[in-house]
């Protein structure tokens, strides 16, 4: 698995979840303790994308926003928070707004699964529906790439140069999923054909512990990672019931299981 310290993540099912993707200064969910872990690095966050409004995914927002008014850093830096639109969720969002009313540099944007936004001239982010709660979303950061058209792949370098010189259009644009965030979920139907990083719910290490269809078992999580052809998969949001005596499980190459209550870097 690649490790370049671009991802910092902490996730314990039912308690706290947050994931920071450094290349785009994007924070996904903001459970309890995020600001304490990040300290002055909280000013590096440009955007926060909430997957849903369960407390373990947003309870850290008041501390995060209020710390940006008191800690050492650019206190006037703008922050945009994207959240799934729902009647139930709006009550929680409004409560957080009240608790953080002294931070005047926050923009709240309600979104639906058709959300799409450019984040650089070569990247954009989209939201998709996940099976977990009524309003829950996952997120994908796509990279716009260029490749040789299929019909020219067997041509030698001399032929390629000749075709380019003649004005032939031999390349095409395509989109590649650089980063997929899917906490929490017990499945999703979004079509993904390969991705670099996949943040995946693996709440139940023992399939017999699964009581409701709101989270994945480890085997379900692995199967989904294989299905979407993920190059690097972080299996997380593990239930705390396993921390004292974790079962002995193995995961395939290219995957890592976060089965300890500590912050991880990748």
Kindly label every feature range from the protein language model.
Residues 1-41, 47, 137-141, 147-148, ...:
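Conserved beta-strand hairpin/beta-sheet module of binuclear metal-dependent hydrolase folds
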Residues 33-82, 110:
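Active-site metal-binding motif and surrounding structural segment of the metallo-beta-lactamase
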Residues 36-42, 117-120, 189-194, 246-249:
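Short loop/helix-cap segments at secondary-structure boundaries that form the rim of catalytic
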Residues 60-68, 91-98, 243-250:
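Metal-dependent catalytic neighborhoods of phosphoester/phosphodiester hydrolases
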Residues 74-79, 85-110, 241:
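Active-site neighborhood of divalent metal-dependent phosphoester bond hydrolases
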Residues 81, 89, 166-266:
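Cap/insert and terminal regions of metallo-dependent hydrolase folds
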Residues 82, 106-112, 126-128, 180, ...:
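General small-molecule cofactor/ligand-binding pocket signal
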Residues 120-193, 197-202:
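Active-site-proximal loop/helix segment associated with metal-binding centers of metalloenzymes
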């Amino acid at each position: 698995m690649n490790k370049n310290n671009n991802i910092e993540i902490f996730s314990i099912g039912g308690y706290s979840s947050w994931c920071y993707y450094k290349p785009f200064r994007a924070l996904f969910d903001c459970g309890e303790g995020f600001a304490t872990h990040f300290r002055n690095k909280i000013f590096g966050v440009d955007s926060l994308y909430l997957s849903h409004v369960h407390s373990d995914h947003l309870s850290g927002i008041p501390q995060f926003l209020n710390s940006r008014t008191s800690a050492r850093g650019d206190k006037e830096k703008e922050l945009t928070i994207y959240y799934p639109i729902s009647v139930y969720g709006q009550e929680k969002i409004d409560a957080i707004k009240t608790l953080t009313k002294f931070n005047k540099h926050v923009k709240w944007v309600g979104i639906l699964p058709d959300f799409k936004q450019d984040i650089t001239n070569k990247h954009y982010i989209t939201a998709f529906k996940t099976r977990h709660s009524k309003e829950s979303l996952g997120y994908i950061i796509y990279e716009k790439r260029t490749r040789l058209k299929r019909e020219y792949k067997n041509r030698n370098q001399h032929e390629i140069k000749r075709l380019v010189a003649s004005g032939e259009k031999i390349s095409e644009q395509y989109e590649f999923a650089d980063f997929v965030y899917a906490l929490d979920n017990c499945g999703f139907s979004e079509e993904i054909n390969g991705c670099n990083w996949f943040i995946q719910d693996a709440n139940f290490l023992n399939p017999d512990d699964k009581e409701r269809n709101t989270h994945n078992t480890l085997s379900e999580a692995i199967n989904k990672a294989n299905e979407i052809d993920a190059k690097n998969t972080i299996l997380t949001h593990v239930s705390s019931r396993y921390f004292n005596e974790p079962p002995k499980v193995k995961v395939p190459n290219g995957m890592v299981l976060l089965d300890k209550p500590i912050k991880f870097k990748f």
